[in-house]
């Protein structure tokens, strides 16, 4: 334990996940979207959140770009900073899950070790890793933010997929190939899986 942690005491909460379940009518989950830039992570996360919200779920999106505007604005894109970025997001997601929320997290999260470390923060039934699969050529042709163009021009060093690696998930709960599936089909598959996962360990919604 670090020296500055010797005088820090963990304060247990009086409310439990079961209390939030009784009030919210659904169990908390983390739905973690990982994939290359341009694969469709944020698009699917936002569409899935809307679908879950319509079902009465309490939801929140943690988006890679948004988090770097605030909490992680001090981090760059070195390997160490990327790992710290994902570590922080995992801890934030855990707070939301402790509060009974369905969290949709959309991050490139290129390293398997970092994704595994986040997964270890949760109970097995609480974490769903979705690999948003799309080949590099297609992602680069989409390039909604112009990032690949800048990376190819040498303006964005250490860009994932160009000069920094992306480690494909070894055992994701779900693979969504956005080269083949549109948004509607993809979201339908995600919601089916989330509902099935919830049914295995508790209802997703009070009447579901």
From Swiss-Prot:
Belongs to the APS kinase family. It catalyses: adenosine 5'-phosphosulfate + ATP = 3'-phosphoadenylyl sulfate + ADP + H(+). ATP binds at residues 35-42. InterPro entries: APS_kinase, P-loop_NTPase. Gene3D superfamilies: P-loop containing nucleotide triphosphate hydrolases. Coiled coil: none annotated. It comes from the Bacteria. Its EC number is 2.7.1.25. GO terms for molecular function: adenylylsulfate kinase activity; ATP binding. GO terms for biological process: hydrogen sulfide biosynthetic process; sulfate assimilation. The keyword Coiled coil does not apply. This is Adenylyl-sulfate kinase. Pathway: Sulfur metabolism; hydrogen sulfide biosynthesis; sulfite from sulfate: step 2/3. It holds the Pfam family APS_kinase. Keywords: ATP-binding, Kinase, Nucleotide-binding, Phosphoprotein, Transferase. Signal peptide: none annotated. Catalyzes the synthesis of activated sulfate. The active site is at residue 109.
């Amino acid at each position: 334990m670090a020296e500055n942690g010797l005088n820090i005491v963990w304060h247990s909460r009086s409310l439990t996940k079961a209390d939030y379940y009784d009030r919210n009518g659904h169990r908390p989950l983390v739905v973690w979207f990982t994939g290359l830039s341009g694969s469709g992570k944020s698009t699917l996360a936002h569409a899935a959140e809307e679908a879950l919200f319509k079902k009465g779920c309490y939801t929140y999106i943690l988006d890679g770009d948004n988090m770097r505007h605030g909490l992680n604005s001090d981090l760059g894109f070195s390997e160490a900073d990327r790992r710290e970025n994902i570590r922080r997001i995992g801890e934030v997601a855990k707070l939301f899950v402790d509060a009974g929320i369905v969290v949709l997290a959309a991050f490139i999260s290129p390293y398997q070790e970092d994704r595994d470390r986040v997964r270890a923060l949760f109970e097995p039934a609480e974490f769903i890793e979705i690999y948003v699969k799309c080949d590099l050529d297609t992602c680069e042709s989409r390039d909604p933010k112009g990032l690949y163009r800048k990376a190819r021009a040498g303006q964005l060093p250490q860009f994932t997929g160009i000069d920094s690696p992306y480690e494909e998930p070894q055992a994701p709960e779900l693979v969504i190939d956005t080269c083949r599936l549109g948004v509607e089909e993809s979201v339908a598959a995600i919601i089916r899986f989330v509902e099935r996962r919830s049914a295995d360990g508790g209802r997703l919604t009070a009447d579901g």
